Amino acid sequence: MKILLTNDDGLYSAGLKAAYDALSELGEVFVVAPAVQRSGVGRSLSIMEPIRVSEVKVNGMRVFAVDGTPTDSVIIGMYEVIGEIPDLAVSGINLGENLSTEAATTSGTVGAALEAATHGSKTIAISLQMPDVSKFELTSKADFSFASKVLRGIAEIVLYKGLPEGVDLLNVNVPAKPNGKIAVTRLARRMYRVSVEKRLDPRGREYYWIYGEETEDAEEGTDIHALRQGYVSITPLKIDLTASVEFDIVEGWFDGLEWEV
């Protein structure tokens, strides 16, 4: 079994090492990850600059450090390092949860998983909740022990049973205070109330800082609600973003719209 492992926190992340240890007994693990922190880049791809790759040893792992995005890492991992589509692709373990439709489109962790799934690999994105702390300040203090057990258990099932029909990948979120149970969930619509703060640099020039505060509401059945109740949230995702609507309804919406050419 060949397993591709990547992340968006970079090759020195403790979560990457925890994932590597959890997966090592299940197959040959190829670690191909961004050389530096690339959180929040979504599924972005480097197309305007060359991508350089260095083979290094980090925390006992052989790592291919990619000077690019998590998506770049997936593509290089599949087509250059492994040379074929792996039996399983894992993105994580991310330091900080990736919940709601917001994370599905902005998270580098989920973006890498979407890319891997697009190429036909069974895929898992996995993240660990870090409440009320900064992922950039407390990286070394995170406890990945339970998240590692979760990853091992889910990965073993996916490797040998595959994914249910209609499911392209799993977005797994592990609570900081787990109750030991899983909940299959849907994506919440949003997790944050976004704000923009204007500031001045030392030279008096304006710049902006975008940040968000968590919403208090969380509908039952969503990934946010499950995590807050202590459940490991497993959200089945599909790549096709086409809305579930009868096309004739949409056609009727734009009835009569045409152009002379």
UniProtKB/Swiss-Prot annotation:
Its main location: cytoplasm. It is found in: Cytoplasm. Its EC number is 3.1.3.5. Keywords: Cytoplasm, Hydrolase, Metal-binding, Nucleotide-binding. GO terms for molecular function: 5'-nucleotidase activity; metal ion binding; nucleotide binding. Binds 1 divalent metal cation per subunit. SUPFAM superfamilies: SurE-like. InterPro entries: SurE (IPR030048), SurE-like_Pase/nucleotidase (IPR002828), SurE-like_sf (IPR036523). The keyword Cytoplasm applies. Signal peptide: none annotated. Its cofactor is a divalent metal cation. One of its GO terms (cellular component) is cytoplasm. A divalent metal cation binds at D8, D9, S39, N94. It catalyses: a ribonucleoside 5'-phosphate + H2O = a ribonucleoside + phosphate. Disulfide bonds: none annotated. Belongs to the SurE nucleotidase family. Nucleotidase that shows phosphatase activity on nucleoside 5'-monophosphates. HAMAP family: SurE. This is 5'-nucleotidase SurE. It comes from Archaeoglobus fulgidus (strain ATCC 49558 / DSM 4304 / JCM 9628 / NBRC 100126 / VC-16).
